[in-house]
Design a protein with these regions (language model features):
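Tryptophan-paired
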Residues: 73-113
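C-terminal motif of bacterial Sec signal peptides marking the signal peptidase cleavage site
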Residues: 25-26
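Early exported N-terminus immediately downstream of N-terminal targeting peptides
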Residues: 41-76
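A short, solvent-exposed beta-strand micro-motif common in secreted/extracellular proteins
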Residues: 117-127
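Bacterial N-terminal signal peptides that target proteins for export
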Residues: 2-17
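Glycine-rich, aromatic-bearing surface loops/beta-hairpins
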Residues: 32, 127-157
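Extracytoplasmic
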Residues: 36-38, 54-56, 115-117, 140-142
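A short, structured loop/turn motif at beta-sheet edges
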Residues: 65-66, 112-117
């Protein structure tokens, strides 16, 4: 192979590599929003959880940014506005609802399209203010929600 042929071969190979990289970049750019990793959620309620009361718990799966922006910042606010939010969100939100008594272990039944969710949030109607904040569990694959006497903790095994 002479120098000129080698130069053309090298230029052509360089062009092919650049075109391939451009296509790969475009595919990842146009693939849409990143989806949630959540595939398993377990709830463990300790004996005296939520002042020995059953805990109303909603795991909210959101499918677009507009619906995510409408979510309240606390559990009590979520439960107060839940009906209106669901009516206005149409197909943008799925909810897995549980009523968890103390001394209980429960698996959360995930909605059929959970793998397409762009966000997953936990709302609890806890008596103590320390258990009322919304929790974003979107990036975690496996989540255990611990309901304790004083609040809620999350474990990501």
């Amino acid at each position: 192979m002479n120098k000129r042929s080698l130069f053309h071969f090298s230029s052509r190979l360089h062009g092919i590599v650049l075109a391939t990289l451009s296509l790969l970049t475009a595919c990842s750019f146009f693939s849409g929003p990143k989806t949630a990793s959540v595939s398993q959620i377990k709830v463990v309620a300790e004996i005296n959880a939520n002042q020995s009361s059953a805990t109303q718990l909603d795991v909210v799966f959101v499918y677009d940014a507009t619906a995510a922006a409408l979510l309240p910042k606390t559990g009590p606010e979520w439960f107060d506005k839940k009906a209106a939010l669901l009516a206005g969100a149409a197909d943008s939100i799925d909810v897995a609802s549980l009523q968890v008594p103390p001394a209980t272990i429960a698996d959360v039944r995930l909605p059929g399209r959970h793998s397409k969710a762009t966000g997953v949030y936990v709302f609890a109607n806890y008596l103590s203010p320390s258990g009322q904040a919304v929790s974003n569990i979107t990036p975690y694959k496996s989540v255990t929600i611990w309901l304790t006497p004083s609040g809620i903790t999350y474990k990501f095994p």
